[in-house]
Design a protein with these regions (language model features):
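N-terminal Rossmann-like FAD-binding beta1-loop-alpha1 element of flavoenzymes
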Residues: 3-27
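Gly/Ser/Thr-rich beta-alpha loop segments that engage phosphate groups in nucleotides
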Residues: 11-16, 44-46, 162-163
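A short beta-to-alpha transition loop/helix N-cap that caps and shapes the active-site region
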Residues: 34-38
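Glycine-rich active-site loop/strand segments that organize a redox cofactor
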Residues: 43-93
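An accessory alpha-helical subdomain
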Residues: 73-85, 93-117
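Predominantly flavin-linked oxidoreductase catalytic cores and closely associated redox partners
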Residues: 104-105, 109-174
Length: 174
């Protein structure tokens, strides 16, 4: 299978990236469902952004990274997206925004965005033999239906950290 972008990790960053990447996109995750950490975040209500998010609050070896990233996509942009999907929310302490009903609404929104963009989602799937090639990347995806080779022009590693092992977080790509 030849694609434009392979994304490893179907958490918030991976799904948002997949929905916006354009072209033929495949996203893979080892979990049974996408967005597992989203589902439990904020006590099950998802603290999805902060109204006071600003570049000066981030530490990085590249001090301009947060400034550039937040100029391209602000907390207001995400709030607008949440509103467009009819997700009700409220503000808690210090500008923290939470879903009124459930974090599952954010997961559903991200899945809808990916589906609308034609993204292929592969769950319970591992990426093996990942190699950088002259034209991009090659790998083997191994999942419930066996193994298949894949080539991609672009690769995004959005595997998150190893913060909650009982939720399936591993040190893969950490």
């Amino acid at each position: 299978m030849q694609i434009d972008t392979l994304i490893i990790g179907a958490g918030a960053a991976g799904m948002m990236c997949a929905a916006n990447a354009g072209g033929r996109v495949v996203i893979v995750d080892h979990a049974k469902a996408p967005g597992e950490k989203i589902r439990i975040s904020g006590g099950g209500r998802c603290n999805f952004t902060n109204m006071h998010c600003a570049p000066h609050a981030f530490l990085s070896q590249n001090p301009h990274f947060a400034k550039s990233a937040l100029a391209r996509y602000t907390q207001w942009d995400f709030v607008e997206l949440v509103d467009q999907h009819g997700i009700k929310w409220h503000e808690k302490t210090l500008g923290q925004l939470f879903c009124d009903v459930s974090a599952k609404e954010i997961v559903a929104m991200l899945r809808t965005l990916m589906q609308d963009a034609g993204v292929e989602l592969h769950l319970q799937t591992s990426v093996e033999n990942l190699i950088k090639t002259e034209s991009g990347y090659s790998a083997v995806l191994t999942g419930p239906n066996g193994s298949k080779p894949i080539t991609a022009k672009n690769l995004v590693v959005a595997t998150g950290g190893k913060s909650i092992p009982k939720m399936g977080a591993t040190g893969f790509a950490y």
